[in-house]
Amino acid sequence: MQIYRRPFETKTWQYRICPAETMVKIHPDLTTSGAGEETSSPYLTTEQESFTIWMKSLVFNTNGCTVFDSKGNIIYRVDNYNSKSCREVYLMDLSGHVLFTLRRQKFGLFKTWEGYRSSSATVESTTKLEYFRVKNNVFQVPNKDSSSSYRVNAGSCRNDEQYCYKMVTRGSSLAIEDNCGKLLAEVKRKQSINGLKLGDDVLTMMVESQVDHSFIIGLVLAHSLINCIL
């Protein structure tokens, strides 16, 4: 087990112990894809990496999202065409191979999205490979200046009493942490070299080492869908 210091906490206790059996690795060399099938990931970071998220589709004048790596190469895309906040969204690579399918679910009053990792390029292969579930902790009125949190259930943490990760918004930034408060990724508005912030639809994402950035993008998309941004 490992002990991490929780940086943004005002409670009296300072440390929290994370039992290994309740945690899901963001991505080990060999990992389980929902149904216990082992598969290697080509999306694991070896060091801190930066990405640019453009909340626009490559298809002209349609809804979606495009993700670039630090060299300007397109690595992920989402094309919703004329639909916004639809019930099912596909995260694809540049070639159009489906990596994750995100589906909206109805659980009480809270908005919930589930992510299904594909074992191949076909949409049908995602039917039973549930990978994560994202929902807001409480009913929240969207406000760009407020703070809100979202719990992420994944792997062995499938019930609502446990969560493996959480997303916290602070103003216009989004932080993704494990359940011990260790930062895994952060998304904020992109700035130019001169320090000027670009448009609201251009974001920069920093992903820490040993993190599956395809999984992180899936969580960012779920957050955008919950808040009707995508």
UniProtKB/Swiss-Prot annotation:
<comment type="function">
    <text>Might be related to the phospholipid scramblase and tubby-like superfamily of membrane tethered transcription factors.</text>
</comment>
<protein>
    <recommendedName>
        <fullName>Protein LURP-one-related 11</fullName>
    </recommendedName>
</protein>
<dbReference type="Pfam" id="PF04525">
    <property type="entry name" value="LOR"/>
</dbReference>
<dbReference type="InterPro" id="IPR038595">
    <property type="entry name" value="LOR_sf"/>
</dbReference>
<comment type="similarity">
    <text>Belongs to the LOR family.</text>
</comment>
<dbReference type="InterPro" id="IPR025659">
    <property type="entry name" value="Tubby-like_C"/>
</dbReference>
<dbReference type="InterPro" id="IPR007612">
    <property type="entry name" value="LOR"/>
</dbReference>
